[in-house]
């Protein structure tokens, strides 16, 4: 029986994936390595330091350190969130439905805590989450399950009794590895991807979620 719902953040609560794309393309281009949308899509859900390390291995640059590149990307994404960030369709209604069922609500994200606070503050939903956890403090980010396991721990719920809501295959792997039930609301780049079949449930948007559907999952 489900006792909690744990949301991913980027691409689930807020349509921030385009912000990450714009920031990566701008920063990597400044380093002399033109970055494409396809490059960005290949690393959706990956923790930012691991993402930068990945591209450094493939396309090493001179000058700024990897840590400095991480900060440049984060600064740009944060600025875009504060100026343009909006809740994804159905998010507020989904939170209402989940709370009405008496389920605990948590967050498990690859983004750093500072960005989490920026997003939740921008959307005005910080008080809706009983527990927030970031892979920033984990040895490994998604697809490793620790960020989900420790988010569940903060909620006081066993992972097997949690529903994880994800938009990326990387995050979906993390949720399943944590023994959670998984709902995928796929990023547009992943629509139709056969790998998403490992999810327990799939919706095109959180706006499709309704009380009867949630009740059937909770049992």
Question: What kind of feature is each model-predicted range?
Answer:
Residues 1-3, 96-99, 112-219:
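Asp-based, Mg2+/Mn2+-dependent phosphohydrolase catalytic module
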Residues 1-42:
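Active-site neighborhood of HAD-like aspartate-dependent phosphohydrolases
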Residues 13, 105-108, 164:
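Conserved SAM-binding loop
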Residues 20, 48, 87, 144:
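Conserved donor sugar-nucleotide recognition element shared by glycan-biosynthetic enzymes
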Residues 21, 25, 45-53, 70, ...:
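An amphipathic alpha-helix signature
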Residues 27-28, 47-62, 119, 152:
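Helix-loop "lid/cap" segments that line or gate small-molecule binding pockets
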Residues 34, 54-93, 101-103:
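Metal-dependent phosphoesterase signature
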């Amino acid at each position: 029986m489900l006792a909690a719902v744990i949301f991913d953040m980027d691409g689930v609560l807020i349509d921030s994936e385009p912000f990450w794309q714009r920031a990566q393309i701008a920063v990597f281009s400044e380093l002399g390595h033109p970055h494409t949308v396809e490059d960005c899509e290949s690393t959706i859900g990956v923790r930012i330091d691991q993402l930068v390390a990945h591209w450094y291995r493939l396309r090493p640059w001179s000058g700024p350190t990897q840590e400095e590149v991480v900060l440049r990307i984060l600064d740009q994404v944060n600025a875009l969130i504060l100026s343009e960030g909006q809740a994804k369709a159905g998010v507020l209604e989904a939170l209402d439905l989940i709370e009405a069922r008496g389920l605990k609500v948590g967050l498990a994200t690859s983004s750093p805590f500072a960005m989490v606070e920026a997003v939740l503050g921008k959307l005005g939903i910080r008080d809706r989450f009983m527990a927030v956890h970031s892979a920033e403090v984990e040895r490994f980010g998604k697809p490793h399950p620790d960020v989900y396991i420790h988010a569940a721990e903060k909620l006081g719920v066993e992972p097997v009794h949690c529903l994880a809501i994800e938009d990326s295959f990387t995050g979906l792997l993390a949720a399943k590895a944590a023994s959670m039930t998984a709902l995928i609301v796929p990023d547009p780049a992943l629509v139709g991807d056969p790998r998403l079949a490992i999810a327990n449930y799939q919706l095109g948007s959180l706006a499709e979620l309704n009380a009867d559907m949630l009740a059937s999952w909770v049992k």
